[in-house]
Design a protein with these regions (language model features):
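Cell-envelope/extracellular polymer assembly enzymes that use nucleotide-activated donors
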Residues: 1-4, 22, 32, 162
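Conserved donor NDP-sugar-binding/catalytic core segment of glycosyltransferases
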Residues: 87, 91-124
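Short aromatic/hydrophobic "clamp" motif used to bind/position activated sugar donors
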Residues: 79
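Short, well-formed alpha-helical segments that are part of the catalytic scaffolds
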Residues: 11-25
Length: 207
């Protein structure tokens, strides 16, 4: 299997269909979709199954361990993450990534650009540097190079930091690709990570 797409979800029945639909509409079909439902009390899990996702219910109350569980379940050669209120911009995202992987067989991580939306305003983020570098959903990872790297169990919004610290310490080959593939909603109250200003907090440890 080429790709595993991991979505951590928390009471996402009102918005997750757009995320799931952007995956199911992909022209490249060699993938699996994994939705890990963290402490959900609504219909998130049943909706995910409607879209062909493998699902698992957990009670971590934190984004990091939920993503870690997705990594444990994943079987694809390459890993992608998506938040439950975000989506891919095109139906050919996986097709483009597969082509880029074939063109760059040495790459361990492929970083791509994204659209950043906050308070109703959306703008493209074209260079992945500074605080935007540390965001797990704007990258595609070779699974056998992730190894033991895992997200933190913190609820402060810095769960990505130890994951990337471990990845960087491996001396992996990173390809920075200026191609927007992802639509990122910066804030939605009630999400697992409470996106707001916490998503990038603590990332200075790596910069």
């Amino acid at each position: 299997m080429r790709f595993s797409i991991i979505i951590p979800a928390y009471n996402a029945e009102d918005h997750i269909r757009k995320a799931l639909g952007s995956v199911r509409s992909q022209t490249f079909k060699d993938y699996e979709l994994i939705v890990v439902c963290d402490s959900c009390t609504d219909n998130t899990e049943s909706i995910a199954r409607e879209y062909g996702a493998r699902t698992e219910a957990v009670s971590y109350h934190a984004d990091g361990p939920t993503r870690n569980r997705g990594l444990e379940l994943a079987q694809g050669e390459w890993i992608l993450f998506m938040d439950d209120d975000d989506w891919w911009l095109h139906e050919y995202v996986l097709e483009l990534l597969d082509e880029k992987i074939r063109e760059n067989p040495y790459a361990d991580i492929i970083c791509f650009s994204f659209i950043f939306r906050h308070l109703g305003y959306a703008r493209p983020v074209r260079r992945l540097n500074g605080q935007h570098w540390i965001a797990c959903w704007s990258k595609c990872y070779r699974r056998d190079r992730i190894g033991s790297a895992r997200f933190s169990s913190t609820t402060s919004g810095a769960a990505d930091v130890p994951f990337f610290a471990d990845m960087f310490n491996k001396g992996l080959t990173v390809l920075d690709w200026d191609m927007p593939l992802y639509y990122y909603n910066y804030w939605r109250g009630g999400s697992i990570s409470e996106k707001q200003t916490t998503d990038f907090r603590g990332h200075g440890e790596l910069l």
